[in-house]
């Protein structure tokens, strides 16, 4: 009887899924892919942020020592500090990213733009989709970074600064971060660091889809839906895309946590005027190697993250019976 009820419930769910428009199914598939992939690598993401922002007591540590220090200061749950904001952000971000990629790709092909029908279409559609998703969800990324930047050791609350002691602001959750950012800078405060983010996401998102789709084209048709195909193709796509754009990610993170840093000699904590000033200042004051701080852990993180993301997305598309692109494009 239990088996019969389970079968009925499963059939009801699939009947409901079948009534959804293709774009709605794509949104759900993308959101699920983003949430699962992001949570799987959350501990590594937090360590990367601490290394990128040169957080006190983490400046000279490697990956393994940083993991031990987070465990010492914040306990096991410390590895997931900021992950709530990250997941809340990544669900709409990934949903929009994958969905708008499909929309932009179909639109380019439908309008017969002079891009052909090969991988260049994936590059352009992926870049446009990445920019769209970032603009819609950036404040949540800002909140995630500020929460992940905090370390709960009491020695971190008071730090020697240029003007005596500087008390680092602390946040209880996403709502407080966003409220404080808006209070300090208005709407622009919610988008602090958006410049390097957009400059970085356009090539990264484009390259990610470009490389993934290009690799898929070399896979035999009978293996196109195989998990063993999605994992390595997604991993390589993420690896190449992140390497090229990583310095911009470092600038973004440092701009996002500026208000948590000690005051400068000018009496403020705004260190960078814009993206390129940030790149130049980091090289001049922190050394060029800081532009790649946390890159090793990012390699460890991005390979499973992108691989899991593409794999879950493709699996969800198959489960939800989303038709292949050739059949789903407008006539």
UniProtKB/Swiss-Prot annotation:
Its main location: mitochondrion. Keywords: Membrane, Mitochondrion, Mitochondrion inner membrane, Repeat, Transmembrane, Transmembrane helix, Transport. It holds the Pfam family Mito_carr. One of its GO terms (biological process) is mitochondrial coenzyme A transmembrane transport. Expressed throughout the plant. It is found in: Mitochondrion inner membrane. The keyword Transmembrane helix applies. Belongs to the mitochondrial carrier (TC 2.A.29) family. Required for the accumulation of coenzyme A in the mitochondrial matrix. This is Mitochondrial carrier protein CoAc1.
């Amino acid at each position: 009887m239990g088996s019969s009820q389970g079968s009925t419930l499963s059939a009801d769910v699939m009947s409901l899924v079948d009534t959804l428009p293709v774009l709605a199914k794509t949104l759900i598939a993308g959101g699920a892919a983003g949430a699962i992939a992001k949570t799987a690598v959350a501990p590594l993401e937090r360590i990367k942020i601490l290394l990128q922002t040169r957080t006190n007591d983490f400046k000279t540590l490697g990956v393994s020592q940083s993991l031990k220090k987070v465990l010492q200061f914040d306990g096991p749950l410390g590895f997931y500090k900021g992950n709530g904001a990250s997941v809340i952000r990544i669900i709409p971000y990934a949903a929009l990213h994958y969905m708008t990629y499909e929309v932009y790709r179909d639109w380019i092909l439908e309008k017969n733009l002079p891009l052909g029908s090969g991988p260049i279409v994936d590059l352009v559609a992926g870049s446009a989709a990445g920019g769209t998703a970032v603009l819609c969800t950036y404040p949540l990324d800002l909140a995630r970074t500020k929460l992940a930047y905090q370390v709960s050791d009491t020695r971190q609350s008071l730090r020697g600064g240029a003007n005596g002691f500087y008390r680092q602001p602390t946040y209880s959750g996403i709502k407080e971060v966003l409220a404080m950012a808006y209070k300090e800078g208005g709407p622009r405060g919610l988008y602090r660091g958006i410049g390097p983010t957009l400059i970085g996401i356009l090539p990264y998102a484009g390259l990610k889809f470009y490389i993934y789709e290009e690799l898929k084209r070399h896979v035999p048709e009978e293996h196109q839906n195989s998990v063993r195909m999605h994992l390595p193709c997604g991993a390589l796509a993420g690896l190449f895309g992140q390497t090229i754009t990583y310095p911009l990610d470092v600038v973004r993170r440092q701009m996002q946590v500026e208000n948590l840093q000690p005051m400068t000699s000018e009496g403020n904590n705004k260190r960078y005027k814009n993206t390129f000033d940030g790149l130049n200042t980091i090289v001049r004051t922190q050394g060029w190697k800081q532009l790649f701080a946390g890159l090793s852990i990012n390699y460890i993180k991005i390979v499973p993250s992108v691989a899991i993301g593409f794999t879950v997305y493709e699996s969800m598309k198959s489960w939800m019976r989303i038709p292949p692109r050739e059949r789903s494009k407008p006539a």
